[in-house]
Swiss-Prot record:
The lineage of its organism: Viruses, Viruses incertae sedis, Bicaudaviridae, Bicaudavirus. In the N-terminal section; belongs to the transposase 2 family. It comes from the Viruses. It comes from Acidianus two-tailed virus (ATV). One of its GO terms (biological process) is DNA recombination. Pfam families: Cas12f1-like_TNB. Zn(2+) binds at residues 328, 331, 345, 348. GO terms for molecular function: DNA binding; metal ion binding. The keyword DNA-binding applies. Disulfide bonds: none annotated. InterPro entries: Cas12f1-like_TNB, RNA-guided_DNA_endo/Transpos. Keywords: DNA recombination, DNA-binding, Metal-binding, Transposition, Zinc. This is TnpB-like protein ORF383a.
Length: 383
């Protein structure tokens, strides 16, 4: 039996597929079977964590789901495994709220046995339904042509059918040949390896903060009416949603740009700041700076950088950011600010912008240089 790959790289791709009467009937039968399976487990499975639970569930449900709900053999197995996952999630929850009920029309499908995707013909074949055309898909779908297909979710929403497929590939071990560092600030993100090879990426924080301010101004203008008036409430929600989408879009694009810059500079290791407990002392900050700190989503940006790096075969390393913006990268002495965000070293005379100083110091830390510096716990964010 093949050994499961440890920490593989996964991506979920959503595709819009054609809707048919047979597909709607298939989904309806699955949802009814899923409801029955969950309540059957409530009565017959007292502890889902016990050994042999899956065999017991198979004996009690497999035949019934095939006969009473007209599900194909493999889909019947998918159905009771889906129900067991829902029941186990509820059972292991310490608070254990209301017993789970199924309302959304979703189907759990297993690759090759329950469904197959042909990217050349752009069709999806689902057991007992047949072939359905792929009507919509992301532009980078072809990038996953050589990845392995895993479990998928078939969902029906607003009269449209979507298939969300998980693609997976093993993580490749690489030999480090060079590194770049990333310094994330509110005004710009700096990516580079030294003071002559770096790129500045302006952020969109001011746009996001603008829409958040518009929403708050409406709440101040209508302190009582905004909760009851649907038009005002919709407007406020749309402003907050725009602010969130702007930063999410920026974070996704930054991940791609950082990887491209690293390739151009001949590096395959990306060093990021260890920002653990970044907002521990957030209450001591001003209200405006606190809002911008939340909107900036430092960890979200780092998440997409790491995801794109792993996808393209690069390593990501988190290093200690302590004093990286104020320590001289040449001699290590503390530097003095002589202008706005511009520092001078009184010892060796080196001068530069604090962001460039930061990437030089960050790039000199980590495993490539066998650093033994302890990880930082409290980080003061850059303005």
């Amino acid at each position: 039996m093949a050994r499961r790959e440890k920490n593989p790289i996964r991506a979920t791709v959503s595709m819009k597929i054609g809707l048919s009467d047979s597909l709607l009937a298939f989904v309806n039968n699955y949802v009814r079977a899923l409801r029955f399976s969950i309540f059957w487990m409530k009565e017959n499975v007292k502890n889902p964590n016990e050994k042999g639970t899956l065999s017991k569930v198979h004996e009690g449900l497999y035949g019934k789901l095939k006969e009473d709900y007209n599900l194909p053999p493999k889909v019947s197995a998918d159905c009771y495994r889906d129900a067991l996952a829902i029941y186990k999630s509820w059972y292991n929850n310490p608070k254990r709220g209301r017993f789970p009920r199924v309302y959304k029309p979703t189907v759990w499908l297993t690759p090759k046995r329950s469904y197959t995707v042909d990217l050349d013909r752009m069709v999806v074949k689902i057991t007992s339904v047949g072939e359905l055309p792929i009507l919509g898909y992301p532009r980078n779908l072809k990038e996953y042509a050589n990845w392995d297909m895993k479990e998928a979710r078939l969902t029906i929403r607003d009269g449209k059918a979507f298939l969300k497929v998980v693609f997976e590939k093993p993580k490749v071990k690489i030999q480090p040949k060079g590194s770049v560092a990333v310094d994330i600030n509110m005004s710009e993100i700096v990516v580079g390896k030294d003071d002559s090879h770096y790129v500045r990426i302006p952020t969109r924080l001011h746009e996001s903060h603008h829409f958040k301010t518009l929403a708050e101004n409406l709440q101040k203008k209508y302190p009582r009416r905004w909760k009851e008036n649907k038009r005002i409430l919709h407007r406020i929600r749309s402003f907050h949603h725009k602010a969130k989408l702007i930063m999410e879009d920026f974070a996704r694009k930054v991940g791609k740009w950082v990887v491209e810059i690293a390739w151009d500079l001949g590096a395959n290791v990306i060093k990021l700041e260890n920002l653990k407990n970044l907002i521990r002392n957030v209450n001591k900050l001003s209200a405006e700076f606190r809002d911008k700190l939340y909107l900036m989503q430092y960890h979200r940006i780092q998440y997409w950088i790491e995801w794109q790096a792993r996808k393209h075969g690069m390593n990501v390393e988190y290093v200690n950011p302590s004093y990286s913006s104020v320590s001289c990268p040449k001699c290590g002495r503390k530097m003095v600010e002589i202008a706005h965000r511009y520092f001078h070293c009184p010892s060796c005379g080196y001068e530069n912008d604090r962001d460039v100083i930061a990437i030089m110091n960050l790039n000199g830390r980590g495993s490539l240089t066998l650093s033994t510096a302890p990880q930082m716990r409290d980080v003061i964010p850059n303005r």
